[in-house]
């Protein structure tokens, strides 16, 4: 029986599509390197972002700015990354919940729920507040000083919920950060595959796969 649900934030309940990042990449190219493909620049930025060394904890804002600085340097662009990060954060703060989220959360009323997100504390709470979304527990990578899929961030949520992992289902869009991370602790998992990608050989296997959150109340009801 599912006694609690933990949710990833971005890509799961909050829509922060790639278009925001490509918008910033276009601004960089237009202002400093006409002719540079914004997608190629964003791929380079992504490479530094996802390849960041997280042994020494940095906030998500710090990782984002540092990875942008490295991408700028790789292309020989002498520009301060900070103004672009400010613009990016301003756009992200306008992010909205996916259309089905409020209906789904209402249908799950009575089940304790938490957000477990690779995000900075004030940033995430501001977005949740603007979208009028309330959760019993909000755990961020900043408050945990650890990023998913590391166990600590999930452990803090479980401790706050006071429910054993076997009775908690985690819902997220990342096979590695969400599905693998939660599964290692014995939590059940629901993969939100909004883009319809196919899992590759060796990818983590969720207990359930859904296209969006619409079916989540029924999924939760059916899980043993």
Where are the model-predicted features located?
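N-terminal helical cap/lid subdomain that shapes the substrate entry/recognition surface
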Residues: 2-99, 109, 120
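Asp-based, Mg2+/Mn2+-dependent phosphohydrolase catalytic module
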Residues: 1-5, 79, 102, 106, ...
């Amino acid at each position: 029986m599912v006694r609690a649900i933990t949710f990833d934030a971005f890509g799961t309940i909050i829509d922060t599509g790639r278009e925001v990042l490509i918008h910033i990449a276009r601004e960089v190219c237009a202002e400093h390197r006409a002719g540079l493909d914004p997608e190629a620049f964003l791929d380079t930025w992504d490479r530094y972002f996802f390849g960041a060394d997280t042994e020494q904890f940095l906030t998500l804002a710090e990782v984002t700015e540092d990875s942008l600085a490295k991408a700028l340097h790789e292309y020989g662009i002498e520009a301060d990354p900070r103004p672009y990060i400010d613009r990016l954060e301003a756009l992200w703060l306008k992010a909205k919940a996916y259309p089905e989220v409020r209906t789904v959360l209402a249908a799950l009323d009575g089940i304790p729920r938490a957000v477990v997100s690779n995000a900075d504390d004030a940033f995430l709470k501001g977005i949740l507040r603007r979208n009028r979304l309330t959760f019993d527990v909000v755990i961020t990578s900043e408050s945990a000083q650890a990023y998913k899929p590391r166990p600590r961030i999930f452990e803090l949520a479980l401790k706050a919920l006071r429910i054993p992992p076997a009775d908690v289902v985690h819902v997220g869009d990342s096979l590695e950060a969400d599905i693998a991370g939660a599964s290692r602790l014995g939590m059940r998992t629901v993969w939100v595959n909004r883009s319809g990608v196919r899992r590759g050989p060796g990818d983590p296997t969720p207990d359930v796969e859904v296209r969006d959150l619409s079916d989540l109340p029924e999924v939760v009801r059916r899980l043993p």
